[in-house]
Amino acid sequence: MKPTRPFHQTPVITIDGPSASGKGTVAALVAASLGFHLLDSGALYRLAALASLRYTIEAHDVDALVKLIDDLHITFREGLAQLDGVDVSAEIRAEEVGSRASAIAVHAPVRAALVARQRAFRKEPGLVADGRDMGTVIFQDAVLKVFMTASVEARAARRHKQLIQKGFSANIDDLLRDLRERDERDSQRVAAPLKPAADAKLLDTSALSVDQAVEQVVQWYEALVPHA
């Protein structure tokens, strides 16, 4: 007889970590490996921001923003962010969208609506959620919590490579400085500071390939849920 799961809800794997730690790529591949749903929580805020711009909803119109967020048709598939079934992965990285995301996130009802949308991604057969507070705030009962990190030098090198491959100019020293400043802000903020959950497994990817990181997360999950 197969053992029963040691929890009563749909399993969730959370993968948190600082910027450029590789958590998004690893989360997408872990989800694909296990056949789980995927949540890119950072992209969710930008998707809401993009939709508000498309529908010309003002950043201060809280009621309209909350209704918009409740009605959004959002999916994450193979690392792509889709709005109403259309890939908008590139569009949500625009500076205008980032600025709007920051502007709407200051409203508590908007943040609450986005938290509810994040939790709604929890569906059978399971969910892999990546972000900064997935294990500490959003899915505190996750069966596996992973906190991914890497040296700031390794993260800057990865970000530099990504930008160059996409045709953007990039300066490694500027990237190093930006990452250090962002790490400081994220770790010191009052609301949901960036930190590992008390029961998280730490995964330093400084010297690991993407495949090695994915394999480690899958092994951890299968050890916790042997019949998965």
From Swiss-Prot:
GO cellular component, as recorded: cytoplasm
Binding site for ATP: 17-25
Keywords: ATP-binding, Cytoplasm, Kinase, Nucleotide-binding, Transferase
Alphabetized Pfam families for the sequence: Cytidylate_kin (PF02224)
Reaction catalysis annotation: CMP + ATP = CDP + ADP; dCMP + ATP = dCDP + ADP
Domain of life of the source: Bacteria
One Gene Ontology term from the biological process aspect of the record: pyrimidine nucleotide metabolic process
Subcellular location: Cytoplasm
EC numbers for this chain: 2.7.4.25
Similarity field: Belongs to the cytidylate kinase family. Type 1 subfamily.
Protein name: Cytidylate kinase
Organism: Paraburkholderia xenovorans (strain LB400)
Taxonomic path: Bacteria, Pseudomonadati, Pseudomonadota, Betaproteobacteria, Burkholderiales
Gene (UniProt): cmk
